[in-house]
Amino acid sequence: MAQLSLLVLSLFLTLISLPPPGASISSCNGPCRDLNDCDGQLICIEGKCNDDPEVGTHICRGTTPSPQPGGCKPSGTLTCRGKSHPTYDCSPPVTSSTPAKLTNNDFSEGGDGGGPSECDESYHSNNERIVALSTGWYNGGSRCGKMIRITASNGKSVSAKVVDKCDSRHGCDKEHAGQPPCRNNIVDGSNAVWSALGLDKNVGVVDITWSMA
């Protein structure tokens, strides 16, 4: 009987020494139910411990990096309106069929393009077939005035002139009309470019390929 009592007591002591369910502290990308489950300054976002965008921590940076097109990694981050955006100094390599995202830009004065086009310090009509390229593809202005060939997934293609940079380094200010920095794989086209490709600009972003014309 004494042995049974000792066994029960030993089992009881073992059980109370275990941490309660959910009390384990998770590090980057570990499971969580609330911020108390996460280590240090990490917070619980969609069931995983991650950096707090409002605090601006980068504890989890590089822990499980999302793959970037062409191996071009972010050079930093820019926080605007409480949301963190990656910045880039580079873009994927240009090929005879470079994958990209086509977005829509208003190149006229007062439009969402912000200031005048960088290539010629002028505003442009949206009836022109013109584009802005991500910082890496803009390449310090070396493609200014040059024509590129854009092909949509519907098979249609159009030639357009490079007149501006879609800034991947800066944003969220008056110069950029409050827009966040561009991703590193953007071809920002005028209304005329979208129309020539038979695309609805209200879609916002579509997959394309492009090359030098």
UniProtKB/Swiss-Prot annotation:
Main location: secreted
GO cellular component: extracellular region
Cystine pairings recorded for this chain: C28-C60, C32-C44, C38-C49, C72-C90, C80-C172, C119-C144, C166-C182
Record's compositionally biased regions (Polar residues): 93-107
Localization in the cell: Secreted
Post-translational modification, as annotated: Undergoes proteolytic cleavage by actinidin to produce kissper and KiTH. Three forms of KiTH are produced by cleavage at different sites.
Key words, A-Z: Allergen, Disulfide bond, Hydroxylation, Secreted, Signal
Record's signal peptide: 1-24
Purpose of the protein: Kissper is an anion-selective pore-forming peptide.
Family according to the record: Belongs to the kiwellin family.
Protein's name according to its UniProt entry: Kiwellin
Organism: Actinidia chinensis var. chinensis
Lineage: Eukaryota, Viridiplantae, Streptophyta, Embryophyta, Tracheophyta
Gene: KWL1
